[in-house]
Curated annotation (Swiss-Prot):
Binding annotation for an alcohol: 49, 69
Note on how the cofactor is bound: Binds 2 Zn(2+) ions per subunit.
Entry's localization field: Cytoplasm
The gene coding this protein: ADH1
Signal sequence annotation: none
Classification via SUPFAM superfamilies: GroES-like (SSF50129), NAD(P)-binding Rossmann-fold domains (SSF51735)
The entry's keywords: Cytoplasm, Metal-binding, NAD, Oxidoreductase, Zinc
Named cofactor requirement(s): Zn(2+)
Presence of the UniProt keyword Cytoplasm in the record: yes
Gene Ontology cellular-component annotations: cytosol
Name assigned to this protein: Alcohol dehydrogenase 1
Organism listed in the record: Hordeum vulgare (Barley)
CDD domains: alcohol_DH_plants
Length: 379
């Protein structure tokens, strides 16, 4: 493309301070260096992780910064050594990477790349420790290696999944983070047998995706557990068959679920990050074969306490990261699940706004309205 090797000036939504509305700025985006790609973002969406680090209540603030990590775009140019993707390829940026060289990437079991796994404290490129974004010569920090709230962004090639160009980017962009995380937690990690009973703790976007995964796997009962009963009706669209609101019961949730399921559920997936919900999700699975999967990220000081007999009685506890999907290897297959109509993505998308109104997406999330809001970069 004519812009290859040159600095590109474009619009980006910049966070200058914690919790303050993003402002539209003209930024300069440097060309990609070795093993990097520059991508024209067409659609992006807002994830809770963006909001968490934008609020910067529980971690070191890093501003000014360009947030965003759920997106779809087209490769504009590539740096030296890049062979996997070329200009014009349709891609999904991913907050965690796959270098394909480290022990994790070579393992059939792990997706936790040594080089490119998520690092929320790094605001620069891994290659040279510099930012590719600037305003008037002043660097602007990156976010989780993606920074998709910009018309153009630069990423390590290991954080870019090349997908079917026929796939609509305004739909499949949501597969680059939360939806795949929940889906994979069910189909790759919990692996519910056909006809089994699954409990999903937390019915936000990730929990609904976990329910969708359980539905795809053939679970016959999918029990949604949430303190917000308003979410229940919507969750039926994602396969939930019944619901438990802990506020409606005097017994512990794990006992309520055991009573409903003749001793415990076959699988549970915990998507809240609340350590008490994690304990409940583990203790509600059936002895002998029950498997609980933890997806939600707990508070840094949280402690998980349960009696060792719960393990000795043959309950299994697993953790997962990005649904155990390897980004470059597996995400193209998730997109194909959508293309084959095995996975419904449209029902996750409840709102859409032009890029100039990106702060509306933050307002919707703050109010708990909707599931995913698509941000259209072309307005």
């Amino acid at each position: 493309m004519a812009t290859a090797g040159k600095v590109i000036k474009c619009k980006a939504a910049v966070a200058w301070e914690a919790g303050k509305p993003l402002t539209m700025e003209e930024v300069e985006v440097a060309p990609p260096q070795a093993m990097e790609v520059r991508v024209k973002i067409l659609f992006t969406s807002l994830c809770h992780t963006d909001v968490y680090f934008w609020e910067a209540k529980g971690q070191i603030p890093m501003f000014p910064r360009i947030f965003g990590h759920e997106a779809g775009g087209i490769v504009e140019s590539v740096g030296e050594g890049v062979t996997d993707v070329a200009p014009g390829d349709h891609v999904l940026p991913v907050f965690t990477g796959e270098c394909k060289e480290c022990p994790h990437c070579k393992s059939a079991e792990s997706n936790m790349c040594d080089l490119l796994r998520i690092n929320t404290d790094r605001g620069v490129m891994i290659g040279d420790g510099k930012s590719r974004f600037s305003i008037g010569g002043k660097p602007i920090y990156h976010f989780v290696g993606t920074s998709t709230f910009s018309e153009y962004t630069v990423m390590h090639v290991g954080c870019v999944a090349k997908i079917n160009p026929e796939a609509p980017l305004d739909k499949v962009c949501v597969l680059s983070c939360g939806i795949s995380t929940g889906l994979g937690a069910s189909i790759n990690v919990a692996k519910p047998p056909k006809g089994s009973t699954v409990a999903i703790f937390g019915l936000g976007a990730v929990g609904l995706a976990a329910a969708e995964g359980a539905r795809i796997a053939g679970a016959s009962r999918i029990i949604g557990v949430d303190l917000n009963a308003v979410r229940f009706e919507e969750a039926r669209k994602f396969g939930c068959t019944e619901f438990v609101n802990p506020k409606d019961h005097t017994k512990p949730v794990q006992q309520v679920l055991a009573d409903m399921t003749n001793g415990g559920v076959d699988r549970s997936v915990e998507c809240t990050g609340n350590v008490n919900a994690m304990i409940q999700a583990f203790e509600c699975v059936h002895d002998g074969w029950g498997v609980a999967v933890l997806v939600g990220v707990p508070h840094k000081d949280a402690e998980f306490k349960t009696h060792p007999m719960n393990f000795l009685n043959e309950r299994t506890l697993k953790g997962t990261f990005f649904g155990n999907f390897k980004p470059r290897t597996d995400l193209p297959n998730v997109v194909e699940m959508y293309m084959k109509k095995e996975l419904e993505v449209e029902k996750f998308i409840t709102h859409s706004v032009p890029f100039s109104e990106i702060n509306t997406a933050f307002d919707l999330m703050a109010k708990g309205e909707g599931i995913r809001c698509i941000i259209r970069m072309d307005n």
